[in-house]
Design a protein with these regions (language model features):
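Edge beta-strand at a domain terminus
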Residues: 89-98, 129-185
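Beta-turn initiation residues at beta-strand->coil junctions
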Residues: 41-44, 74-79, 103-107, 127-132
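Bacterial Sec-dependent N-terminal signal peptides
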Residues: 3-4, 17-41, 148, 159, ...
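Tryptophan-anchored aromatic micro-motifs
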Residues: 29-54, 91-93
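Bacterial N-terminal signal peptides that target proteins for export
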Residues: 1-10
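Acidic, glycine-rich flexible loop segments
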Residues: 98-123
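Bacterial N-terminal signal peptides
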Residues: 9-19
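N-terminal glycine/threonine-rich, aromatic-flanked beta-hairpin/loop signature
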Residues: 49-100
Length: 185
């Protein structure tokens, strides 16, 4: 009986070790992902019959301290002078599950998945899946709360740290541009 109890205990310990390994990998991905990334996501916006290409995209990932493989952030596509706006921004909620990064663009109420990627402290490149569209991207890590002192709620401006000025929001009746991902030739 004691032998059976020992075998059952060892089997239970081995099974628990196997079930917890995938969470560790997702946590490591989320930890490395945390911060601000800048690069080309090959995004365009269609507005009033015209298509405008983003010059660069900025993504911010803030890790949830209670659910380590998920969090919030923002996605901003910056445009050149010929577009009727300087940027298109979305708040995001993101989650890493099974190595796939799933991002919910809250204002558009759409989802983007990132898979087949390489991620380290400096670079993030891979494939975006948006509906039936697959697009390659490459981004550089520009800031991280894990790198240096973090001045929460303050911006650096001409040598001094100061609270940011309040922004303005578009009127709710304004027509909004539609985000599209363009495939590379």
């Amino acid at each position: 009986m004691k032998k059976l109890s020992t075998l059952m205990t060892m089997a239970l310990v081995a099974m628990m070790a196997l079930t917890l390994t995938s969470c560790d990998e997702d946590y490591d991905i989320a930890y490395t992902l945390e911060g601000t990334w800048r690069g080309n996501m090959y995004v365009s916006s269609v507005y009033d019959g015209y298509t405008y290409d983003a010059t660069y995209t900025e993504l911010c990932f803030v890790q949830d301290p209670y659910r380590y493989s998920s969090g919030t952030g923002y996605w901003i596509d910056h445009y050149a002078g010929d577009a009727p706006w300087r940027y298109v921004a979305n708040h995001t909620e993101w989650k890493v599950r099974g190595g796939v990064i799933r991002i919910h663009l809250m204002e558009e109420d759409t989802y983007v998945e990132i898979a087949n990627y390489r991620l380290d402290d400096n670079y993030f490149d891979g494939t975006i899946y948006y509906g039936d569209t697959k697009v390659k991207f490459r981004m550089n890590h520009t800031s991280s709360p894990n790198w240096n002192d973090y001045y929460y709620g303050y911006d650096y401006w001409t040598g001094y740290y100061a609270k940011p000025a309040p922004g303005v929001r578009a009127a709710s009746g304004d027509t909004k541009p539609m985000r599209v991902f363009r495939t590379q030739e």
